[in-house]
């Protein structure tokens, strides 16, 4: 009898132990499917946000990279001179093709439109409302030149901003027989003064220059100033109507 009672007690304890393990514990609660789904969606949002931020940063970095393909070149005028820019920004011609002052960046800023920048000075060649050439620290509409191939395979550079209003004749970059720069409205495209032969040295990548208003730039000292940089002039036949007096 005692053995039977012991066996019964042992059996009862075993059954109670098995029932205890089979019963879900209060501390071990099942997580609701909706909660899991919310956590999953939250993780996805975090992942997509990080991917988007990374993509934006990558695009910003790409925008900062140079994207314009231009050339470093010398510009040989048919008059027998190389165009050069002195350290103070003054322009003229020289027969010496070994000096760094004759190196220019030809940067495409539009369809057959270029900016001409001195390699050593970093200054842009610009033409003002009276046809004078001057150096500009900032890239403005006066720094844009249309690049056209003439019938003799020389290249001519004309101002994108100024021309004769009555005839529509363009104003050109040019050197005279003494190697001095000429007023744009005095240069004819059929004359050797306007004919340049680019002699590329290397292909280079450039960042697109930021366009500034003409009035923002200040001409370098000792160089013929641009009247239109001091005051915005209303153009009439290539001449400013209102001039700003200088002292």
Swiss-Prot record:
It holds the Pfam family FGF. GO terms for biological process: adult locomotory behavior; chemical synaptic transmission; JNK cascade; neuromuscular process; positive regulation of sodium ion transport; regulation of postsynaptic membrane potential; regulation of synaptic plasticity; regulation of synaptic vesicle recycling. Belongs to the heparin-binding growth factors family. GO terms for cellular component: cytosol; nucleus; synapse. The lineage of its organism: Eukaryota, Metazoa, Chordata, Craniata, Vertebrata. CDD domains: beta-trefoil_FGF14. It comes from the Eukaryota. This is Fibroblast growth factor 14. The gene is Fgf14. GO terms for molecular function: growth factor activity; heparin binding. Signal peptide: none annotated. Residues 15-25 have a biased composition (Basic and acidic residues). It comes from Mus musculus (Mouse). Keywords: Growth factor, Nucleus. It is found in: Nucleus.
């Amino acid at each position: 009898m005692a053995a039977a009672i012991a066996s019964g007690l042992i059996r009862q304890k075993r059954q109670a132990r098995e029932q205890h393990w089979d019963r879900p514990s209060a501390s071990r609660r099942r997580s609701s499917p909706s909660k899991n789904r919310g956590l999953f969606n939250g993780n996805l949002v975090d992942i997509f946000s990080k991917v988007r931020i990374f993509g934006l940063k990558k695009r910003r970095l790409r925008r900062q990279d140079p994207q314009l393909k231009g050339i470093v070149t010398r510009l040989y005028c048919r008059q027998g001179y190389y165009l050069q820019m002195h350290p103070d920004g003054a322009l003229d011609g020289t027969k010496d093709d070994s000096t760094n002052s004759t190196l220019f960046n030809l940067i495409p800023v539009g369809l057959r439109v270029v900016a001409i920048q001195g390699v050593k000075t970093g200054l842009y060649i610009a033409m003002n409302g009276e046809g004078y050439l001057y150096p500009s620290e900032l890239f403005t509409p006066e720094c844009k030149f249309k690049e056209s191939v003439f019938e003799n395979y020389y290249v001519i550079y004309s101002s994108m901003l100024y021309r004769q209003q009555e005839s529509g004749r363009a104003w050109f970059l040019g050197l005279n027989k003494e190697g001095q720069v000429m007023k744009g409205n005095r240069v004819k495209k059929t004359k050797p003064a306007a004919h340049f032969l680019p002699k590329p040295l290397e292909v280079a990548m450039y960042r697109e220059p930021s366009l500034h208003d003409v009035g923002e730039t200040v001409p370098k000292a000792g160089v013929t100033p641009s009247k239109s940089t001091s005051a915005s002039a209303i153009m009439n036949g290539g001449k400013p109507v209102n001039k700003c007096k200088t002292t």
